[in-house]
Amino acid sequence: MCSIGEDDFGDEGAAHAMVVEALPLGIVLSPGNCSKCDVNSNELYKLNFREAECRECFLAYARHKFRAALGAAKILPRNAEVLLVLDGSAKSLVLLDMLHFAQTQNTFKRLHCNVHVVYVEEQHVQDRDPVGLEDLLSVSRQYAPFEFYVIELGQGCSLQRIKDYSPSLKANNELIYKLQKLQSLTARQDYLQQHRKNLICSVAQSLHCTHVFESNISVDLATQLLTAIALGRGASAALDVALLDDRLSGDVKLLRPLKDLSEQEITFYIHAQRLKPLFQNGSHYGMERGQTASIQNLTSAFVANLQQNYASTVSTVFRTGDKIAVNSNPEQASCVHCRSALDSELSDTLLAIEYSRSVSEAGVSLNKNEKDLEGLAKKRLEKQDGLCHACRTIQAEFDSGNLL
C-alpha cells in the first residue's frame, strides 16, 4: 500500500505539477492530448495547478489519494470489518465508488477488508421527503456484493437490510421532539451532529465493524475545525479533522479517507464515473435558515467564500488542523455524550462563562454578592454531570429533559 507525502500532494493538488494556467479550470470537452500519457482524449480534466489530463489519468490520481491516505498511517488492518456511511451526497458516492474499485483489483492491489454500507435516512428530520427506495436499491445493485443497510436518524432500533426497509412514522421520532426543545439552531445542529456520530457507532457495533469510513473532504474539515473552536470544543478539534478519530465507544475507529480531496476533484470524479447523487450538497439540517442563523451556518458560509476567492487559505486552515496534537491521557474521563475529554481543570475562561450565566439567571432580582455568584459558578463547573463544556451548553438550552 502506498503512502502520501508533501511532494505528492500539496495544498492545491500536486505541488510538483504547478503550471501557468493556460487552460480554463474544469472539464475541457474539446479533444486534446493528455499531459500524462500523451493519449488523445475527447474529454480532458483540468485541476488547479495541474496540467489537463484524460479521464483514466485523473481517476488514477484521485484514487491514489484515497489509497495513500489509508496507506500512510497503516491504520486499516487486513480483513478488517468496515462500515461505510452513505448519506446520498456526491462525496459519499465517490467514497463508495473508490472503495468498490479498490475491492475489485487484483490480489496485489486489492484493499483487503469486508465492507458493509449503511444509508442514514435523515430527510424526515429536515421535514423533507425521503429518498426513493428504488434509488437506494439501484445503488445497492450497482455496488454488489457490498451489504447495504438503512437506519433512520432518531430511530436507534430501525436498522434494516435495504431489501426489508420500510419507513417508520415521523410522529414516533424522539429526536425531532428533542430538537424542538432546543432554543437555538446552533445547539440543534451541534446536538444532531453528536447524535448522528453515536448512532453510527451503535450500527458499527451491531454489525461487528471495527472501522467506520466517513466521506468528509478538505473543505468540510476546514469548516469543522473552525466550528469546533467557536463552539468550545477546541480541546478535541484535532480529532474532529484527523484521519483517525478514536473517540467512539467500543473501540470503533472513525476514518476519513477522502480528507485530502477537494470539492473540484469530487465534482470531476462524479462526472468521470457518471454517478448520480441522491440529493445535492448543502442540504444539511438548518442550512435553509440562512447564513447568520447559527454558528455552523456562518462558519460554512465563511469557508465557502474563502474557497471561492482564496482557495489556498482554506487548505492552510485544513493543514493547520493536521498539525494540532491532542493531549492524550488514558486516565482522563470522557464526556458521556460526545466522548471528548472532559474539561477537568478549572479554567478562568470557563469560570467567567458560568459566572455570566449565573448573573443572567438571577435577573432583576439579583440579591447575591459577587462571592456568592462566583461560588455558584465554581459549583457548576465541579458538578460531576459527565458532560464537557460544549455539551453542557446544549443541556442548558433544553426547556426540560435530559441531553441523553
Swiss-Prot record:
Subcellular location per the Swiss-Prot or TrEMBL entry: Cytoplasm
Source taxon at top rank: Eukaryota
Pathway(s) annotated for this protein in UniProt: tRNA modification; 5-methoxycarbonylmethyl-2-thiouridine-tRNA biosynthesis
Segments crossing the lipid bilayer: none
GO cellular component, one term: cytosol
Keywords attached to this entry: Cytoplasm, tRNA processing
InterPro entries per UniProt: CTU2 (IPR019407), Rossmann-like_a/b/a_fold (IPR014729)
SUPFAM superfamilies named among the record's database cross-references: Adenine nucleotide alpha hydrolases-like
GO molecular function, one term: nucleotidyltransferase activity
Record GO biological process: protein urmylation; tRNA thio-modification; tRNA wobble position uridine thiolation; tRNA wobble uridine modification
Stored PANTHER family: CYTOPLASMIC TRNA 2-THIOLATION PROTEIN 2
Function text: Plays a central role in 2-thiolation of mcm(5)S(2)U at tRNA wobble positions of tRNA(Lys), tRNA(Glu) and tRNA(Gln). May act by forming a heterodimer with NCS6/CTU1 that ligates sulfur from thiocarboxylated URM1 onto the uridine of tRNAs at wobble position.
Family from the record: Belongs to the CTU2/NCS2 family.
UniProt name for this protein: Cytoplasmic tRNA 2-thiolation protein 2
